Amino acid sequence: DKPDLRIDLTATNVSSLFAGSAFEVLADKTVKAVAISNCALTRKQIDKLLADVEVQTGSKACWVKVDENGNLTGGVSKFLTDCKDALTAKLNLKPGSFVCMAAGKKAVAQKTAGVIRTMLGKRIPGHFDEEQYALCWIVDFPMYEIGEESGALEFCHNPFSMPQGGLKALEDAEGDMDKLLAIKADQYDLVVNGYESASGAVRNH
């Protein structure tokens, strides 16, 4: 929730491509892919990237390249033959493209993909503009989430924030888990170049 917008890469949700897949690493999980074209990373550089991602996030990432004939090669390519065409179309892959993927529970995959995006953007020339200040407001935070360990309803960020729609939003959602999870918090962050520089909220009243 604090993207560095100086980087022009994006993380794409490709989870649906691996629903029911025989490849358990990606099957039936949230899968986020960061694709980059004309990538000349060596195997040593790729291994270093994956190692650095694991150190920072505690999660493993996987990768494939696209060869001059448009075929997937390297990394986990041998497990992706069934979804090669769909993955190529979804990510608009071309010869020379490199794809790095993160998989797991939603929050884990999102965090890991964010780290992959940042590392690739800063390591490969042409994808990171150091000369600009990129500011953005982060809004519409979910009020609640299902805790990954507890399995129960938990506050996502700040329990003292007012829900968007006021107390009526809570009253209308009482007893309905889907409605509770759809409630947004009335809070914000201001992000500058990937760093949270300010935050605020309407407090409960």
Where are these predicted regions, by residue range?
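Class II aminoacyl-tRNA synthetase catalytic cores and aaRS-like
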Residues: 1-205
